[in-house]
Amino acid sequence: MPGNNRNRRNNRNRKKRKQYGFYFDYTLLFVLVFIVGFGLTMIYSTSSYTAQIEEGDPEFYFRKQLIFTIIGFALMIVETKILDYHYLKNLAVVIYIGGLLCMFLLKTPLGITRNGATRWIKIPGLGQFQPAELVKIGTIAMTAFLIVKAGQNIKKFRTVIVICIIAGFAPALLVYVLSSNMSSALIVALISVVMTFVAYPGYKIYVALTGLAAVAFGAFYSWIKKMAASGNMTGKFRLNRILVWLNPEKYIDDKGYQTVQALYAIGSGGLFGKGLGKSLQKLGYIPESQNDMIFSVICEELGLFGAFCLIALFIVMLWRINHIAQNAPDLFGSMLATGVFAHIAIPVSYTHLRA
């Protein structure tokens, strides 16, 4: 009977909770709720003008984000009250393959092209969804699954390479090829690298690889600095974005416009900002101010003090996630928490550096 099966599953979950010990981090919950509430407030503040002009509704972007926020909290409640995270071990491959298949929907009529890039798909009744986000979740689950499956073989560096290729590099390549989304592709790849780095007991190879990467980065930075100083653009879109980021004033009338306007916003905010909702740069000066450049508007409205408080909240969140990863009852739980840590830390660092 379906009812009996459900009762048996609930009993198994309760037994697992007793076996491993149920722990709820209320500090993490408080910080999470505060950041989400703050994020919704700033999305409304930064997007209301643009939404009114483009959609005829100042709450358009805010409402979309609110819907997904409610869905997210509902799933969190179900996860903490009913399910046990160990079920993800059985669904890891399904989530992983599902994320990859969703990427191909970008090439169907469901794909939404905006500013020359197709990165979103339509979901009837809900709005839009970025398949790369599901790929990130699939990468976390699949990497954790493969690490647990590897057992003692995780001590072999070739096992680490295989896991990174299967769970991280291959999905990252697919994300980049199908959506031209370099930032999401890098996040997917780095999530698997961070997780395997934590799981792999050796460190000498990573030290050597880090040294080689530092030398390569130093050479590249020296070359790109000279390019930026000369003001010459290349034929490569990604390189041009780096050139503009390093020297935006040289391209203020073209590709450097958004970066310069973001710098104006940060500089004009001062220590305590102009006040919530009083940004001038969001009034059409910063394109897509509610997206990648939202941090610059936060600096303008709340000042450096508000920006540092937000960064401090993210640091507390990452600290609590790290605590959970270190004290998880098993390797799979530890790896899941590590993946979540990387999933948050990498884009947060990227967004703040970009602004």
Question: Locations of the language-model features?
Answer:
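Short, Lys/Arg-rich, polar N-terminal cytosolic tail immediately upstream
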Residues: 1-19
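N-terminal membrane topogenic signal
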Residues: 18-31
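Hydrophobic alpha-helical transmembrane segments of multi-pass inner membrane proteins, especially
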Residues: 33, 45, 55-254, 296-353
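Alpha-helical transmembrane segments of multi-pass membrane proteins
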Residues: 35-47
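Re-entrant/interfacial helical elements at transmembrane boundaries that shape
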Residues: 278-282, 313, 354
